Amino acid sequence: VTPISRRTLLAAAAGNPRFLYRDYSRCLPDYLSGLAAAAYARRRREMAALTTVEAVRKRQRWARAAFWRLVGGEPERTPLHARTVGGFERRGYRVEKLVYESRPRFHIPALLYAPAAGSPPYPGVLFQMGHSLNGKAYESYQRCCQALAQLGFLVLAFDPMGQGERTYYPDASGTRTRLASADDEHSLPGRQMLLAGDTATRLQVWDAVRALDYLAAHPLADPARLASTGQSGGGTLTMLLAAVDDRLAAAVVSSGNTENVACARYNPPGATDDAEQNFVDGGPAGFDRWDLLCPFAPKPLLVSVSAKDSLGTYSPRYLEDGREEFARLQAVYRVLGRGDRIAWAETPLPHGLSYDSRLNTYNWLRRWLQNRPEPLVEEPPTSPESDASLWVSEGGNVVRAWNGETPASLLRAGLRRVGPAPLEGLLRVERPDAGLRAVRLARTASRGLTAEAIEVRSSARVWLPAWLFLPERPAPDAPVLLAIEEAGRNRRWRESELWQTLARRGVIVCAADVRGVGDLLPEYGRGNPRYTGPHAGEEDFAWASLIFGRPLAGQRASDLLALAAALRAHPAAKGRKLRLAAAGRMTAPALFAAALDGAIDSLYLSGGLVSYRSVIDAEEYTAPLASFVPRILLHTDLPEIAASMAPRRVVLAGAVDAAGRTLPAADVRALYGAANVEVRARAQWDEAALER
């Protein structure tokens, strides 16, 4: 006896025994959940196997190597060209203003807080900033640096990428960003870097390594007693540095991103964050954020968190996942015989470097770097300075002051081709199953045609809904049209609209949705809407897809391959050519699919991105991360992919630059010189464009 499916029961309960649409909004979240579950299970097994010192040491070596591999490789050390440009004295400490270069002409402004009392060499502390717009001038960060200096520590505080004097997208003032936040100063260039095989993670961690180079070599510092600390993004930067630099003797991570993306109760799209905190391909590699701290064991480590951070700053799973992974790392410390060197602290206060969190930092560093176990119960007197009084550069912007490099200029200068690579591998495409067929959910009449609601299974947990409009009298030589646009299949289905109009002219039309589009627009995650609302956009799902090794552009190309295969097998389409048409942000996946499927006879692209190189060359851009493919510019670009389709015809109508501006046809032709590519000046998405 064939069991009755849940879907059939629900349909019957609704009074309609024929069909019931799926909740397609679950498809992309469920697909990612499957990838997350596999990554979590793998890492859990591997961590559970760390029962000997030898196993731990092997894992530590693996974690460091995996980190450098994922972020783009360890850069070459170049001269720092450090120089002191000013300073001042305060009661109990003095401040030196200095600048150095983490890469040639890539300037890092920093402050060195030196104790006025005691005798050198002092233990050194690298203080790393959270995402404060004013960087090292942020009030609570100043207080911590001032207090540490008065407690006998030599402290180096530097502006991170895109913050303070390193604002790379300044407004008219020259010192404030014109972007929405410091996060955007990180992620705007960080997304560009992915196309060229680089990452914001690599840039940020190398800035920290070079800062530690300066601190370790300072005549007042004891290179055997170096630590790193920071709050929020600075805590995460401390984690990055702990993964790669053995010179650290202690660390305090305060409200850092201590949440794995692949966690026990993964809540799609998961704990994605700004660019440097997302490890592309980390999922299939078995690497996640807590692996950053594995190479640091068994050195003294304090992980300090805010109990309110799971209510909006980080994901709703932040605390429970952090505690679970802390226990795993604590077990590693115990295997190494130093369970006393790792601790967890919580504050009930909101996200910030609060007074109690600062005291925890002082006491941890005093205990392990100064051999002072007695707890400090009161912070030394502090008095934050004005932003301008801490400027190292004239005018408060190092790029303008010294005509230096930016992340974008470094990226453009360093871009090199390394040779061809299979497009299928870059995209991580999943080919459709042999014999794939569309499932007809319903069939109904319309004026002059028949409309079918069909569904195609593309991957595990992913079904693609589509409308198939079948003319009463199909034109004998007309190809089947498979059409996709970012507004989804329901945008133009009505009698007087595009799809039915084309069908009444004799064209078989399939208007479909792919992952993240139309009915497959993903549902919100569960939990506090202060977090789940802002983290439910396409970019968050694109980041999650990249982390789990399945670029969203590749997923959408896979969907189109499945739809094309199913259409070719449909009785009404057999023997007909297949034409694929895409508009706007769907053009890149369509080009990929057509290049990979030689049975797609022709391709029409309206209003699509002209090239990935145009994204690299743009200072600002609107091209979406969902269309980006990591490392693609090392091997190829969109014009070459279009040329690879020859002799099949490709039409580019109204191609746009990275900011979405329509380009002159002559400029597009200069890039697309292949004989099989026709360039049209204006984007069209109407009967005239799609019928021929």
Where are these regions (language model features)?
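Generic beta-strand/beta-sheet core signal
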Residues: 113, 128, 158, 229-231, ...
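Primarily recognizes the serine-hydrolase "nucleophile elbow" in alpha/beta-hydrolase
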Residues: 213-284, 563-635, 641
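Alpha-helix capping and helix-loop boundary segments enriched in small/acidic/polar residues
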Residues: 132-140, 178-181, 195-203, 228-239, ...
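Alpha-helical segments flanking ligand/cofactor-binding loops in enzyme cores
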Residues: 146, 239-240, 294, 500, ...
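N-terminal secretory signal peptides and thylakoid transit peptides that target proteins
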Residues: 1-13
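Cap/lid segment of the alpha/beta-hydrolase catalytic domain
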Residues: 120, 124-209, 216, 262-267, ...
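Alpha/beta-hydrolase-fold serine-hydrolase catalytic core, especially in secreted/extracellular enzymes
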Residues: 15-108, 289-291, 297-299, 304-465, ...
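Aromatic-lined carbohydrate-binding surfaces of glycoside hydrolases
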Residues: 158-164, 172-190, 199-206, 221, ...
